[in-house]
């Protein structure tokens, strides 16, 4: 295991009370969260979302991405189901960090798309490590999930890491004029499954 469970507390939200569980990476001391709703211990596949940190979208209401919209929709769906969990994967900006994300935004303002901007800064299109999320699921005793995602790479990596993705559930929300090019680029260059809804 790459991380350990270190703390937990109730988290009241507009959608109901979640159990917030804090994890710490053993090698780096970086922290991550799980938000658990209801009983996730049965063997039935659990509704789940792996949500990568996005300060600008999640906390600052940015329209440049769909992250904040996805976070709210996922928590709402989990609460409506009365059972599920959201992993808050703290790898900001597809794991290039907040300051580099701002630099990437500046390049996008000059005409680069989200993938090209990462490359111009010396990064891959996506630097995230989803094997950490597989370990979080395992620590929580969750081995079979119904995953809220548009990203088939998440499905593949979690599956290879021993998590059964019984179903992929699209999470297509929040498109607007500010993020349309970003979403189109994720579909065209990163394989995200978005166009059934938008085209």
From Swiss-Prot:
GO BP term, pick one: riboflavin biosynthetic process
Family to which this protein belongs: Belongs to the GTP cyclohydrolase II family.
Protein name (record): GTP cyclohydrolase-2
Catalytic activity: GTP + 4 H2O = 2,5-diamino-6-hydroxy-4-(5-phosphoribosylamino)-pyrimidine + formate + 2 phosphate + 3 H(+)
Biological classification of the source: Bacteria, Pseudomonadati, Pseudomonadota, Gammaproteobacteria, Candidatus Palibaumannia
EC number(s) from the headed UniProt entry: 3.5.4.25
Gene Ontology molecular function: GTP binding; GTP cyclohydrolase II activity; zinc ion binding
First-tier enzyme category under EC: hydrolase
Organism: Baumannia cicadellinicola subsp. Homalodisca coagulata
Pathway of action: Cofactor biosynthesis; riboflavin biosynthesis; 5-amino-6-(D-ribitylamino)uracil from GTP: step 1/4
Pfam families for the chain: GTP_cyclohydro2
A GO-annotated cellular component: cytosol
Stretch forming the signal peptide: none
Binding locations of GTP: 49-53, 70, 92-94, 114, 149, 154
Annotated InterPro entries: GTP_cyclohydro_II, RibA, RibA-like_sf
């Amino acid at each position: 295991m790459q991380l350990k469970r270190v703390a937990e507390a109730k988290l009241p939200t507009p959608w109901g009370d979640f159990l917030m569980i804090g994890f710490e990476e053993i090698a780096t001391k970086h922290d991550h969260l799980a938000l658990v709703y209801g009983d996730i211990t049965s063997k039935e596949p659990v509704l789940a979302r792996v949500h990568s940190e996005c300060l600008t979208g999640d906390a600052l209401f940015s329209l440049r991405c769909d992250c904040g919209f996805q976070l709210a929709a996922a928590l709402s769906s989990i609460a409506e189901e009365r059972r599920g969990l959201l992993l808050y994967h703290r790898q900001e900006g597809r794991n290039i960090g907040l300051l580099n994300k701002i630099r990437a935004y500046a390049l996008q303002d000059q005409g680069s798309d989200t993938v090209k901007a990462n490359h111009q800064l010396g990064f891959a299109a996506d630097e995230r490590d989803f094997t950490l999320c597989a370990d979080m699921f395992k620590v929580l005793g969750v081995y079979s999930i119904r995953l809220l995602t548009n990203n088939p790479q998440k499905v593949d990596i979690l599956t290879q890491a021993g998590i059964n993705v019984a179903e992929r559930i699209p999470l297509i929300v929040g498109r607007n004029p500010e993020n349309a090019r970003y979403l189109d680029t994720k579909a065209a260059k990163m394989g995200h499954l978005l166009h059934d809804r938008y085209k």
